[in-house]
């Protein structure tokens, strides 16, 4: 568990007055951020293989003392709540999987839910990976005002020396 309090004066951010203008670095505001973070893991065995179920929660409360009416790229578009859960499992001697669920809510009230998953198969010195990101094709913004990509499928190969 972590508890924190951050005071920032003359916070530098990239802002713009409207969506057609370019971002400019500017000292924009005095911001006080308070919050806490909780993380826990539950470990167990299934068919003699280790499994892990992880939970994490973050809460942020930004007290924007000098209101910024322009579009801020980072600081004023912060998260208020973030919940992440991960299930890491080993199905067979050489097969592992990860399933991740993330829920986030911004200070302005918008929220999103994202599911990711991956499977790793180890064969001798090789690891073959298949990763699915944003499985249900959620529309969301991670940071700033840049939309995140839709669903994607990635394939990987790693050789271990």
Question: What residue spans do the PLM features occupy?
Answer:
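Outer-membrane beta-barrel translocator domains and adjoining extracellular loop/strand segments
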Residues: 3, 11-20, 64-72, 100-101, ...
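Asparagine-centered polar/low-complexity signal
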Residues: 26-27, 134
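C-terminal beta-signal and adjacent terminal beta-strands/loops
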Residues: 116-161
